[in-house]
Amino acid sequence: MERSSSYGVEKLQKRCYHEWMSLQTKHIDDLKEALMCQRNNDDKLEDLVGKIVNDYHTYAGKRSELSYRCCAHYFAPSWNTPIENSMLWMGGCRPSSFIRLIYALCGSQAETQLSQYLLKIDDDFDINHGGFMSDLTATQLGKLNDLHLEVIKKEDKITKTSANFQDDVADLPIADVVHADVAVEDALDKHEEGMAVLLAEADKLRFETLRKIVDVVTPLQAVEFLLAGKRLQLSLHDRGRVRADVCGGVGGAAV
């Protein structure tokens, strides 16, 4: 792909990311309001959760479409901070981290401060108990544990396939790489096409994991989970920008 074409695609990908981040901020406001005003209205909570999950599905679809035009940018995005890029798995977070966040919200003493921070709604309204996730039943926990194991297995499969793609490129003769042989370009094109497929699979796994989680938990627990996840993501991005400034780097603009 020509440099100008690749740059144009990257601009579209970056715009897609910033639009998603703006929507994330709106989601947080909506989730806060739901916890303050609608916590006893399951229908309203379900509608909000469904909308947010659908918004993520739409975003993942846009990412997939753009990745087939040039997927390499998603594996070290210029719009991310360096610390965020160091934590990426297949262009995003590990789906299994969604479930680990739930475990952190369940109320163990080791995670109490984190839970209280992530669930803080505003300066005048806090959830001071362990959070609604602390009310998870044994049946819910069992289903989440089964999902966790299933997701880890699928993550490992995607990771292994990615490693195989890298090995295929590494096996190219060094002389061919130096002289930019046509076979090398074909191999790199094949590599990027394969990685675009894997990125789509990873995004699908992220979406399916999110959807299955909200099916297991109550509407109120789903709102709590989504709020904590989005606050954690934004906090990591902000912290990454601070660290980038201290190190003299350039952090991405605010997901």
From Swiss-Prot:
Q: Where is the DOG1 domain?
A: 10-246
Q: What Pfam families would the database entry show?
A: DOG1
Q: What does the record give under GO molecular function?
A: sequence-specific DNA binding
InterPro entries per record:
Seed_Dev/Stress_Resp_Reg (IPR051886), TGA_domain (IPR025422)
Q: Which GO terms describe its biological process?
A: DNA-templated transcription
Q: What happens when the gene is disrupted?
A: No germination phenotype.
User: This protein is called what?
Assistant: Protein DOG1-like 2
